[in-house]
């Protein structure tokens, strides 16, 4: 009987492993308490059935909320009992003033980007306008310079032709006057006018210049169709007295309508 009781006692005693200070629990079928998701949060079972030993749970909170506590819980031994690794977390709402600074920063960055873009566009527009205005100014200067050059060449041509015509008419008047009894004779004037009219048929000018010169002669003399060479002309020059210079503009249709007997204009001296 004594040997039998000693054997039973030896079997009932727990055996200790060498190098291990924690005894192996006798109860290997422990479970953890059932957990529920926090208010306005969710619960996800990653491993296990939610209460058995070795179960892993993950908690989630929606946007605008902050989790207070650990979001990962595990069912494990805690000493001689089975319990969760930490307490159940809570989802706490984030106050609005905490997100106000972030919103202000985002709005300020957007506004600054828009201002930079507008300033860049304004700068580019001003540069383009300046380039266009500079090109237009150069073109206008070139046009004006060319117009003045052409105008000066036309004036030199007209003056050269007029000076040559005046010398030729003076020679004709001298020759005709000498043949009719001298320059003071009364019979020399018709011959002078005839030779002048005959010689001036070969001298033509632009109709626009004719109209401009006709307006000038009208302001100088009472008769717009005659201009005496003894009087000073618009250019300030005068010629010998008693000589008339007539300029006829040749037209393919003949003389001007309504005034067949008179020339269109006289060239002033």
From Swiss-Prot:
It is found in: Cell membrane. Residues 176-190 have a biased composition (Gly residues). Residues 125-269 are cytoplasmic. Residues 1-23, 171-237 are annotated as: Disordered. Disulfide bonds join 32-75, 61-91. Pfam families: Sushi. The keyword Ribonucleoprotein does not apply. Residues 1-103 are extracellular. Residues 30-93 form the Sushi domain. The chain crosses the membrane at residues 104-124. Keywords: Cell membrane, Disulfide bond, Membrane, Sushi, Transmembrane, Transmembrane helix. This is Sushi domain-containing protein 3. It comes from Mus musculus (Mouse). The lineage of its organism: Eukaryota, Metazoa, Chordata, Craniata, Vertebrata.
